[in-house]
């Protein structure tokens, strides 16, 4: 199982031509994003309360699920 943070996973999604790619790009451009965080609740709280990320939270939920699957391989 991989030991990468959500941020590291998001970097692999940058460049996709969909809303998940848009979210990954916004995460990359957010200099305050918690780059070493893995916890869903911590990341979700940050996006909802502290960031200017404009992608719907449902996209974050979907991308986080993809992250969990990605960690398995």
UniProtKB/Swiss-Prot annotation:
Family matches, as SUPFAM superfamilies: YozE-like
InterPro entries: UPF0346, YozE_SAM-like, YozE_SAM-like_sf
Top-rank taxon, per record: Bacteria
Family: Belongs to the UPF0346 family.
HAMAP family reported for this sequence: UPF0346
Protein name: UPF0346 protein SH1485
Organism: Staphylococcus haemolyticus (strain JCSC1435)
Lineage summary: Bacteria, Bacillati, Bacillota, Bacilli, Bacillales
């Amino acid at each position: 199982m991989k030991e990468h943070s959500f941020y590291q996973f998001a970097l692999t999604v940058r460049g996709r031509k969909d809303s998940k790619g848009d979210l990954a790009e916004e995460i990359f451009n957010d200099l305050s994003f918690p780059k070493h965080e893995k916890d869903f609740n911590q990341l979700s709280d940050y996006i909802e309360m502290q960031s200017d990320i404009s992608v719907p939270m449902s996209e974050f939920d979907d991308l986080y699920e993809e992250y969990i699957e990605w960690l398995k391989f």
